[in-house]
C-alpha cells in the first residue's frame, strides 16, 4: 500500500495519538489500517512547561521495536494538525521538536508509514518505555 496519495499520507502513531489516548481525537476521520512495529526505542518525556502531560519520544536507533497504529489521514488539514501537536514545522526542521519521516512498518497492512521521530535534547528523555508500548506502559 502506498505511504502517500495526493493528499492522504499514512502515519504510524505510537503515543498520545493512539486509540484510547488523550490526543486520539485528532485522528477522527482518518482510516485505521491496523497495528504494527517500527524500529527504535520509545522514551518517556516527563511533564514540561510547554506540555502539561508526559509523552513518548521515538529514537530511531534500531535497538528494539516500538508498537504503532497506522492511519491514512483524511488530508492536508489533518496532517497539519498532527504536525502542530508534534511541534513539527516542515519549513523549519531545525527548530522542530520532532521530524516526520517515512519508515518501514512490520506486521501491519502497510509496508511504510510516516512517523514522528524525536530530535529534541536527549537530556529531556527520562527512561525507556518497557516493550516500546506506550499504552501497555501506562501512557495515555
Language model regions located:
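Glycine-aromatic micro-motifs
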Residues: 2-140
Amino acid at each position: 500500500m502506498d505511504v502517500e496519495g495526493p493528499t492522504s499520507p499514512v502515519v504510524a502513531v505510537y503515543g498520545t495519538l493512539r486509540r484510547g489516548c488523550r490526543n486520539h481525537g485528532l485522528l477522527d476521520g482518518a482510516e485505521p489500517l491496523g497495528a504494527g512495529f517500527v524500529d527504535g526505542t520509545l522514551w518517556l518525556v516527563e511533564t514540561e512547561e510547554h506540555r502539561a502531560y508526559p509523552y513518548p519520544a521515538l529514537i530511531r536507533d534500531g535497538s528494539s521495536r516500538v508498537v504503532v497504529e497506522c492511519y491514512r489521514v483524511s488530508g492536508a488539514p489533518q496532517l497539519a494538525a498532527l504536525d502542530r501537536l508534534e511541534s513539527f514545522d516542515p519549513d523549519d526542521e531545525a527548530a522542530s521538536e520532532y521530524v516526520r519521516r517515512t519508515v518501514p512498518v512490520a506486521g501491519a497492512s502497510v509496508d511504510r508509514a510516516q512517523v514522528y521521530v524525536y530530535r529534541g535534547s536527549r537530556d529531556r528523555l527520562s527512561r525507556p518505555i518497557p516493550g516500546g508500548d506506550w499504552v501497555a506502559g501506562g501512557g495515555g
